[in-house]
A protein has these predicted regions:
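Proline/Glycine/Serine-rich low-complexity intrinsically disordered segments
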Residues: 150-157, 180-182, 188-191, 202, ...
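An extracytoplasmic/periplasmic, membrane-proximal ligand-sensing/linker region
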Residues: 49-50, 57-62, 73, 212, ...
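Bacterial signal peptide processing site
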Residues: 42-45
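Bacterial N-terminal signal peptides that target proteins for export
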Residues: 5-30
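Pocket-lining segment of extracytoplasmic ligand-binding domains
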Residues: 119, 192-193, 197-288
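Short, glycine-/small- and polar/acidic-enriched structural segments
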Residues: 47-186, 192-194, 204, 211-217, ...
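C-terminal motif of bacterial Sec signal peptides marking the signal peptidase cleavage site
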Residues: 37-40
Length: 308
């Protein structure tokens, strides 16, 4: 009798076999085949892919659209660290640099859920969209208003007449509007430049194409590391984001079970992330979030709360 294989999610191929002494060579051959098949048996099919890539439709996996912000980080960690594989969760994380593009996927039929902010969700619902979605996991993040390092902007009162990169009908829009009103500036005292992509918004700030930018982590920390100035950090309560699940997916027995496994994967991921830097976390930041290795120590991530 071969010893039990060290993982429970192997499918029909990964079974125990018994052999008589007269068929020892055959048994060894089958054992070798089992060992060769072991990596495939262990995989749940969890993947990370570009949202722009047209992947074949896969109704057997749980598909979520994620913008590359700190709020989505636990989902990437759960895939890269093998947490999803250990739970047998075939999670497909579709990656987007702009919230608008992630929302387009969420509102379509190519994913089962996605990450967006509460202002955008309210905006869509006011227009008769996103009414068939449930808030499934409340997420943690961190957002800041940054000013170009070469400009003489060191305080919020220096913002008059400046151009700020943000996105309309989103938490960044709400945040900079609240700051403008608190400074008693007129609507034409501050110029809003709509830049949906977080990556491009960050690059425009670095290249002095805009004076300021509202950026999520890890882009904000990268900007500070490059000499730009953090003028203000938003309160968590005003930049709330969540994973929303389509009710159609939750009514499906398979996807509902996968969604419950996703909660477990998320909780395991946040426990690990909250402990600080690790090879898996560094890998996610470098490979998925495109953080230069030299800036890893400068990244300031939020504390992540477990979901229930």
């Amino acid at each position: 009798m071969l010893p039990a294989l060290p993982h429970r999610n192997f499918g029909l191929f990964c079974m125990s076999y018994s052999f008589s002494s007269s068929s020892r060579s055959l048994g060894l051959g089958l054992a070798a085949l089992l060992l060769l098949a072991l990596p495939a048996c262990r995989q749940s099919g969890a993947t990370i892919e570009s949202g722009e890539r047209r992947a074949p439709d896969d109704s057997t996996s749980l598909r979520i659209a994620c913008p590359l912000t700190a709020e989505s980080l636990p989902f990437y960690y759960a895939v890269r660290s093998g947490i999803c594989d250990s739970l047998g969760l075939p999670l497909r994380v579709k990656t987007y640099f702009a919230q608008f593009d992630a929302d387009t996927a969420l509102l379509g039929r190519t994913v089962d859920g996605g990450v967006t902010d509460h202002y955008r969700a309210a905006y869509y619902r006011s227009r008769g969209r996103m009414r068939n979605f449930d808030e499934f996991i409340a997420l943690n993040g961190s957002w800041s208003l940054l000013a170009g390092g070469r400009l003489r902007i060191r305080e919020l009162r220096n913002l008059k007449g400046r151009t700020v990169g943000m996105a309309r009908y989103a938490n960044s829009d709400h945040y900079i509007t609240r700051l403008r009103d608190s400074l008693r500036l007129k609507s034409d005292d501050l110029f809003f430049a709509q830049v949906n992509s977080f990556k491009i918004r960050h690059l425009m700030l670095e290249n002095e194409q805009i004076d300021c930018a509202v950026l999520p982590e890890p882009y904000a920390s990268r900007a500070v590391a490059n000499g730009n100035v953090r003028l203000s950090s938003a309160l968590p309560s005003e930049m709330r984001m969540s994973l929303y699940m389509n009710q159609r997916a939750l009514r499906n027995k398979r996807h509902n079970a996968q969604a419950q496994l996703l909660r477990k994967a998320y909780n395991l991921a946040v426990v690990a992330i909250n402990k600080g830097r690790s090879p898996y976390l560094d890998s996610v930041l470098v490979k998925d979030y495109q953080v230069p290795a030299a800036q890893l120590s400068a990244i300031r991530l939020p504390h992540y709360d477990a979901t229930h």
